From Swiss-Prot:
Phenotype caused by lack of the gene: Early flowering.
UniProt domain RRM: residue ranges: 198-271, 283-356
Keyword hit for DNA damage: no
PANTHER family noted in UniProt: RNA RECOGNITION MOTIF-CONTAINING
Pfam families named in the record: RRM_1 (PF00076), RRM_2 (PF04059)
Protein's GO biological process: meiotic cell cycle; positive regulation of growth; positive regulation of meiotic nuclear division
Role played: Probable RNA-binding protein that plays a role in meiosis and vegetative growth.
Protein name: Protein MEI2-like 2
PROSITE patterns registered for this protein in UniProt: RRM (PS50102)
Alphabetical list of InterPro entries matching this protein: MEI2-like_RRM1, MEI2-like_RRM3, Mei2-like_Rrm_C, Nucleotide-bd_a/b_plait_sf, RBD_domain_sf, RRM_dom
Record's signal peptide: none
GO molecular function: RNA binding
Originating organism: Arabidopsis thaliana (Mouse-ear cress)
């Protein structure tokens, strides 16, 4: 846009080179544009005024640089003199050409206001010459919890001093470089992408938990340094230990522990790059002016008198600096007070507390791997932890990887310690550091419209309803976005991987079609009449008049911060489920997400409700209704095949449809008690796959026998394992309250699976609607390996009605008197002769 303005002003065409940094030519461009607009007497100013912003922290001036899009960064001793400021090719437009009076007008009267606090922080002598300390800078960026389909970094000993980063969007690669005279451990990322820390970020906290309960739960592992509970009502707390081993032990022992019927989700918290004074001490001391003849063993003997030392590190290009990390931050403070300004090896040393995370990846260990393993194990035994006797992570010993120009690691799923440098949210001194172009281009770039997202299993919402706002999973906290370039607001799911990019589609799951996007829409038009009428089904579907109220209390996620998102569009009841957006398609009937069959949606048409303009789902086209005879009270169902655009985004469909607008399916007990909630069909999630239908029925009937009239457990025909969830229809909405209290957050007793059950409303509501869905040949015809097991408990209904309902589609056996049916597909390769054998085989 700037170049266009300048072109208009000067009356000639100007083009920026496609790979040239805009900031490089900005001084000359602005100078010429202002001169053109003001007749040659205008002001000439630089575009680097962002340096003078005191409202934004200069977090990255110590490790990042703005560079051309095709260049790479590297900091080492070959760096040119930083006192010389060179900005791209703009040397020809020197500041000498700027009129002095123009500069006087631009500058404030009081020179102290020019750079408030900036000169004091500008210490070029302390600039690092490697990117080993590059990591997340926000307390909420915990990393971890992800299951990435990429090669583990633990198998590579990578010299982080050779790391080089690019500003090409979110593509990241780092190149091992030979590091002379070092042999030993090279620390890599902690498992699950986390870096060990003394501070634990505990999510999914019940707001009613007392501080004393948290202290009693975490104190057995070590003395607590601080307990931050101000955000407990938003679902998380932060617990900081003095000893890093205590944090490791607490995380290992308490991960997935139940507290007030909530499963704790614990991660390491990365300290901020600009911590407060009380948080500055992270247990690491920096020794300046230490003689090179002083060995690490001598330092270990001297500093070890004040506490247990975790490791001693030295940087390859700064031989006069050493890093000493203590397990306990109090020991580091004691050593700092005792040994600062003391003499070692004939030189007066200076001690300072290292900034959090500074230079902790490159290390020359003072102890062997076995010794560290023994110390950590002994500490776990002392605090009584039942965790495994292994240190937190893989810490290989050996020489670093030799430098190779063609060896690179590409992390398309996000790398927590590398971020793009040329982005809008990185102001400050990063722009004045000189660029070092490199000939290395061995990486696979992704779209430059993507930001680096930790745990970024990102969902793309419909543009008409949510305006590109992505939701996270229930029990999740909106995470920090690093290096984000996209303009859309994003809430990131915690246990996920991959990138998400916004794209425009006509429909998304959860968005109504255009004819429903106006406030006057109150119902579904009938195919036989132009009269609009609401749903009138038993156990009912939400009435159209209740559409607004259905969204009222579902705008936030349980155990997390409110999303503060307001719905401006009314929605129909069939708008897609966060977990089962297609009824059965996402629960395992079609496990091949690259198959277009998984896109097919099925809308159930009820008497008086059929419509040719019903919402067909994500990119689906509607078809004429297919009538079926023999079903009582059901006239037709509507199978919806996939449209052509559904094939294009097969890979995105699972992630995009899984977490969309989960608030609408949240069970609100207050609404049930007040009578505002009339839905009765639930989905039970996280069922162990080895649970059989009889096991599930027995567990439900233990306390809720007679409270439900429909139970369906989808099962894989080949391996006899269920698909991890079931559908249940309660007789009355009031029965949901005790059922929710029993099963939501329940740990399944059998098989020691560790899965925690959760409940939500299903997309298809009502026993009749579920039965009609199963009656549809298209819903099961292509998936012969699956069959549902359905239980009925209607004592007043005749058995012949049930047989009539399913006889045209399913082979039915009635093993008991409570009308518990085991249903098999007719296309099943199993023989259908003996009903009793079929029932035993399917169960």
């Amino acid at each position: 846009m700037v170049s266009s303005i300048i072109a208009v002003a000067e009356g000639k065409k100007m083009e920026l080179e496609p790979n040239k940094s805009l900031s490089a030519d900005m001084p000359s461009l602005l100078s010429r544009s202002s001169e053109a607009f003001n007749g040659g007497t205008g002001y000439r100013s630089s575009s680097d005024l962002s340096m003078f912003s005191s409202s934004l922290p200069t977090l990255f001036h110590e490790k990042l640089n703005m560079t051309d899009s095709d260049s790479w960064l590297s900091f080492d001793e070959s760096s040119p003199n930083l006192n010389k400021l060179v900005i791209g090719n703009s040397e020809k437009d020197s500041l000498e050409d700027v009129e002095p009076d123009a500069l006087e007008i631009l500058l404030p009267e009081d020179e102290n206001e020019l750079l408030p606090g900036l000169i004091d922080e500008l210490n070029f002598t302390g600039l690092p010459d490697e990117l080993d300390d590059l990591e997340e800078c926000d307390v909420f960026c915990t990393g971890g919890g992800m299951e990435l389909d990429v090669e583990s970094q633990d198998n590579h000993a990578v010299d982080a001093s050779g790391m080089q980063i690019s500003d090409r969007g979110a593509a990241n690669a780092f190149v091992p470089r030979k590091r002379p005279n070092t042999a030993g451990r090279v620390s890599v990322e902690h498992p699950n992408g986390e870096h060990p820390s003394r501070t634990l970020f505990v999510r999914n906290i019940n707001s009613s938990v007392e501080d004393s309960e948290l202290s009693a739960l975490f104190e057995p592992f070590g003395e607590i340094r601080s307990l931050y509970t101000a955000c407990k009502s938003r679902g998380f707390v932060m617990i900081s230990y003095y000893d890093i081993r205590a944090a490791h032990a607490a995380m290992r022992a308490l991960q997935n522990t139940l507290l007030r019927k909530r499963t704790l989700d614990i991660h390491f918290s990365i300290p901020k790059e600009n911590p407060s004074e009380k948080d500055m001490n992270q247990g690491t001391l920096v020794i300046f002016n230490v003689d090179t003849t002083v060995s690490n063993d001598e330092l270990l003997q001297l500093f070890g008198a004040y506490g247990e030392i975790r490791e001693i590190r030295e940087t390859p290009n700064r031989r006069f600096h050493r890093f000493i990390e203590y397990y306990d931050v109090r020991d580091a403070e004691t050593a700092l007070k005792a040994l600062n300004r003391s003499e070692i090896g004939g030189k007066c040393i200076k001690l300072e507390l290292s900034r959090p995370g500074g230079a902790r990846r490159l290390s020359v260990p003072s102890q062997s791997q076995d010794l560290e393993r023994t110390e950590v194990t002994n500490f776990y035994n002392q605090v009584g932890s039942h965790v495994a006797n292994s240190p937190p992570g893989n810490w290989p010993i050996g020489s670093p990887v030799k430098g190779s120009p063609s060896h690179a690691f590409t992390r398309p799923h996000g790398l927590g310690m590398v971020r793009p440098v040329n982005s809008d949210n990185m102001p400050g001194l990063a722009s004045i550091l000189p660029a070092h172009p490199s000939s290395f281009h061995g990486f696979s770039p992704v779209s430059n419209d993507q930001g680096l997202l930790n745990h970024s299993n990102q969902t793309i919402l419909n543009k008409g309803l949510m305006h590109n706002i992505s939701y996270g999973q229930p029990h999740s906290l909106p995470e920090h976005i690093t290096g984000g370039i996209s303009n859309s607001m994003r809430f990131i799911a915690p246990h996920s991987s991959g990138f998400g990019t916004s794209s425009d589609h006509r429909y998304r799951w959860g968005s109504p079609p255009q004819h429903m996007n106006y406030p006057g829409y109150t119902g579904v038009s009938s195919s036989s009449s132009s009269t609009e009428r609401p749903f009138t089904v038993r156990h009912g579907f939400p009435f159209a008049e209740r559409q607004a109220s259905l969204l009222g209390k579902y705008q936030h996620h349980v155990g997390s911060a409110p999303s503060s998102i307001h719905f401006n569009t009314q929605m129909n009841c069939y708008t897609g489920s966060p977990e089962i957006p297609l009824g059965f398609s996402d629960m395992g009937i079609n496990r091949n997400y690259n198959s277009a069959h998984g896109k097919a949606n099925l809308g159930v048409s009820l008497p008086g409700n059929s419509s040719e303009q019903d919402f067909t789902g994500f990119g689906m086209s509607s078809m004429p209704t297919v009538p079926f005879g023999g079903s009582r009270g059901l006239q037709s169902v509507r199978p919806e095949p996939f449209a052509e655009q559904g094939r294009i985004h097969n890979h995105e469909s699972h992630n995009q449809n899984q977490f969309i607008d989960g608030g609408r399916y949240h069970i609100d007990l207050d609404r049930i008690a007040s009578g505002d909630e009339i839905r009765t069909t639930l989905i039970i999630k996280n069922i162990p796959n080895k649970y059989t239908y009889k096991m599930l029925v027995a567990e439900i009937d233990e306390k809720h026998k007679g409270d439900y009239d429909f139970l369906c457990l989808p099962t894989d025909f080949k391996n006899k394992c269920n698909m991890g969830h079931a559908f249940i229809n309660m007789v009355s909405p009031l029965h949901i309250v005790p059922f929710q209290q029993t099963f939501n957050g329940k740990i399944w007793e059998k098989f020691n699976s560790g899965k925690v059950a959760s409940l939500a409303y299903a997309e298809i509501q009502g026993k009749s609607a579920l039965a009609s869905y199963m009656q549809t040949p298209s819903s099961m015809k292509e998936q012969k390996q699956l069959f549902p097991e359905v239980s009925y408990h209607d004592d007043g209904q005749d058995a012949n009605d049930h047989e009539q309902l399913f006889s045209s589609i399913w082979n039915i056996t009635a093993p008991d008197s409570d009308w518990s049916y085991t249903m098999d597909l007719i296309e099943n390769p199993r023989e259908n002769g003996n009903s009793k054998n079929a029932a035993e085989e399917s169960s």
